[in-house]
């Protein structure tokens, strides 16, 4: 993707300096400041407002700097004006996330679940799990709505950063600078900022281009991380020395130089500045070599590397007086920032830009493991055991054959739609964390049981791109394991401590099995249902699990005023959309790599597109004959499937399915709006989920 042709002068102004460097950094690096800094400030302020609304008070400063400029304004001067607000929102969130999270946030994008579900590990000070998910969902949804292709790059980078930093040992020791720099590049999130910059410029790099520029950009990342250490050291050192601090080490190059060379902090700072200068010069040289060599004709990469270079002086300039590193400036900075936001457009039009001096600064300027504290493999019954008083030397049978199939299906990758759906409903219903965990475990347990049984009943050899459970363990063991897991799900419902929840469970399980019985009957008897019959089957079978978790959550909701909001129409629509979407994607190339090429045709199932085609095509059509043959022979070959697909397209059945999905999506969004008005609460988590499911 080539960036939209905006010149640097369209987006930013050069900032004059009295010397070629800024406090000994970024020699001969020009500095620019974005013309639309008011939008950057608005984006950050919106994030802070959302944080206070959904989570609670904010204790630390973020991106703002009324003297040298907002972080995004000076670090990303080439950013498109229409994208700087959302990027600043992301920066602000990242700063606040860094403030409160010790290892990994209690909720963040799940690395294993295709960006749909949200993890829950550990918070340090964040009050609201749901609130964090709300902010993340709103942020991701905005990125995806602006530029879905570039947004996916940002999301992947965020996931990689979170997954990597979670695994980083913050207490580790470093023996040399190179080892520390490799650690710090990831720890500071420099690659993530890089992808946000590309998003802002509408630049998309191919994997080959990423590999080509990797050695060029590394010294830039290193310079950014070390400069961050230099300017943040004073406040980190002060916190480190507090009596209540339990830290044994600091993740800061200044501190490491003090330890390595037994020097005081001023000498250590000087040495950090010196090695930072080396990386700055190395980046300039590598860019020059690339532009004069193999990148001579690659204008996209030249622009990208030039823009990346502006991060170095921008980061230094912002660090000079940002209240984040100089907390005594917070009060004055807040007053100036409020005033500047009111007058920002006038300031931009008049070209008012403060000069940065090289002088010193003054203050003026397992399947169910998460559901219970009890052992996952022991009974939770409080009744006396029949085993009590038995001989102690009796042979004890293990659970490996009982749980093996269940643990296998649970180990396969999942998109986590149901877990994300629970997170979304909890925005409105606000259940205690322990009940949310139990309901998620119930949903996962039931879903895994249904997958094991469905694959046997449908004769499916694959599940999520891997061998189906029964092809490994055999049908008998798989059925036995699935039956046990269903009982385990009922046992988990008891942990909700509400007899009505058990009634709800039985009601919806009954609906689910009734729906499944019709699906199996139609396939076995070669009886094509009407569209109305099929949709009712979906409502009971696929919608049953969605409806079960919704009803359980409403029963346990802490906000009594929201216990009676009309969620059932929305939940039924979600179930219907999810199944028809699955039918559609099973017949598209995108889905075939996971579940097998058009596997529904092998199974002879009457999916939504086939039902529509049956209404239009004659009784003796190739589709009916081929489906009958597939049921008898155990499947169709590729050419037969391609013929069926061709007929489905020719008959307009695929187009009709797409139209139906669009209509359902419109109804879902309308229902979301209605529930938001009824509850008085926006649901960004659900909006993001719906956006990710949209075909």
Swiss-Prot record:
Mg(2+) 1 binds at residue 98. One of its GO terms (molecular function) is lyase activity. Pfam families: polyprenyl_synt (PF00348), Terpene_syn_C_2 (PF19086). It catalyses: isopentenyl diphosphate + (2E,6E)-farnesyl diphosphate = (2E,6E,10E)-geranylgeranyl diphosphate + diphosphate; (2E,6E,10E)-geranylgeranyl diphosphate = variediene + diphosphate. A motif (DDXXD 2) lies at residues 454-458. In the N-terminal section; belongs to the terpene synthase family. In the C-terminal section; belongs to the FPP/GGPP synthase family. Hexamer. This is Variediene synthase. The gene is AbVS.
């Amino acid at each position: 993707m080539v960036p939209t042709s905006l010149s640097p002068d369209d987006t930013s102004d050069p900032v004059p300096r009295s010397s070629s460097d800024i406090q000994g950094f970024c020699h001969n690096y020009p500095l620019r400041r974005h013309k639309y800094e008011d939008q950057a400030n608005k984006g950050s302020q919106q994030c802070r407002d959302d944080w206070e609304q959904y989570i609670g008070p904010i204790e630390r400063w973020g991106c703002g700097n009324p003297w040298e400029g907002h972080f995004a304004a000076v670090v990303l001067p080439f950013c498109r004006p229409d994208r700087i607000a959302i990027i600043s929102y992301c920066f602000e969130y990242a700063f606040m996330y860094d403030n409160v999270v010790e290892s990994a946030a209690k909720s963040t994008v799940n690395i294993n679940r295709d960006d749909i579900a949200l993890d829950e590990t550990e918070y340090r000070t964040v009050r609201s799990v749901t609130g964090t998910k709300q902010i993340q969902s709103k942020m991701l949804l905005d990125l995806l709505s602006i530029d879905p292709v570039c947004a996916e790059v940002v999301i992947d980078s965020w996931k990689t950063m979170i997954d990597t930093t979670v695994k980083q040992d913050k207490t580790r020791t470093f023996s040399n600078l190179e080892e520390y720099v490799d650690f710090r590049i990831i720890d500071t999130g420099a690659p993530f900022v890089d992808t946000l910059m590309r998003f802002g410029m509408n630049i998309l790099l191919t994997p080959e281009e990423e590999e080509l520029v990797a050695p060029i950009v590394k010294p830039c990342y290193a310079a950014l991380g070390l400069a961050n250490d230099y300017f943040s050291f004073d406040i980190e050192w002060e916190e480190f020395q507090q009596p209540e601090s339990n830290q044994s080490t600091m993740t800061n190059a200044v501190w490491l130089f003090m330890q390595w060379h037994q020097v005081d902090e001023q000498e250590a700072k000087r040495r950090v500045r010196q090695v930072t200068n080396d990386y700055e010069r190395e980046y300039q040289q590598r860019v020059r070599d690339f532009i004069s060599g193999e990148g001579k004709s690659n204008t996209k990469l030249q622009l990208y590397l030039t823009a990346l270079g502006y991060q170095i002086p921008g980061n230094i300039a912002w660090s000079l007086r940002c209240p984040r590193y100089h907390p005594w400036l917070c009060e004055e900075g807040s007053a100036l920032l409020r005033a500047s936001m009111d007058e920002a457009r006038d300031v931009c039009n008049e070209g008012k830009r403060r000069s940065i001096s090289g002088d010193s600064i003054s203050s003026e300027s397992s399947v169910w493991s998460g559901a219970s504290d009890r052992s996952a493999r022991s009974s939770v019954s409080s009744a006396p055991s029949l085993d009590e008083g038995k001989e102690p030397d009796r042979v004890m049978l293990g659970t490996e054959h009982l749980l093996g199939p269940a643990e296998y299906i649970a180990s396969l990758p999942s998109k986590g739609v149901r877990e994300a759906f629970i997170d979304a409903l909890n925005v409105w219903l606000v259940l205690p964390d322990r009940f949310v965990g139990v309901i998620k475990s119930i949903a996962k347990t039931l879903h895994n049981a249904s997958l094991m049984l469905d694959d046997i009943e449908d004769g499916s050899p694959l599940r999520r791109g891997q061998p189906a459970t029964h092809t490994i363990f055999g049908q008998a063991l798989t059925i036995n394991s699935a039956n046990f897991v269903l009982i385990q799900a009922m046992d988990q419902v008891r942990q909700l401590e509400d007899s009505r929840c058990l009634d709800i469970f039985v009601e919806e399980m009954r609906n689910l099995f009734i729906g499944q019985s019709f699906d199996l009957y139609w396939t076995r008897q070669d009886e094509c249902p009407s569209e109305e019959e099929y949709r009712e089957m979906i409502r009971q079978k696929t919608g049953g699990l969605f409806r079960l978790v919704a009803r359980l959550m409403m029963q346990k909701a802490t906000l009594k005023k929201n216990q009676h909001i009309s969620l059932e129409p929305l939940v039924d629509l979600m179930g219907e959309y999810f199944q028809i979407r699955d039918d559609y994607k099973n017949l598209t190339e995108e889905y075939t790599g996971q579940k097998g090429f058009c596997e529904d045709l092998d199974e002879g199932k009457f999916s939504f597109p086939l039902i529509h085609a049956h209404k239009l095509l004659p009784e003796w059509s190739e589709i009916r004959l081929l489906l009958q043959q597939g049921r008898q022979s155990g499947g169709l070959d590729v050419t037969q499937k391609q013929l069926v697909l061709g007929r489905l397209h020719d008959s307009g059945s695929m187009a009709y399915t797409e139209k139906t999905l669009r209509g359902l999506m419109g109804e879902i969004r309308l229902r979301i709006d209605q529930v938001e008005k009824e509850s008085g609460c926006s649901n960004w988590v659900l909006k993001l989920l719906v956006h990710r499911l949209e075909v």
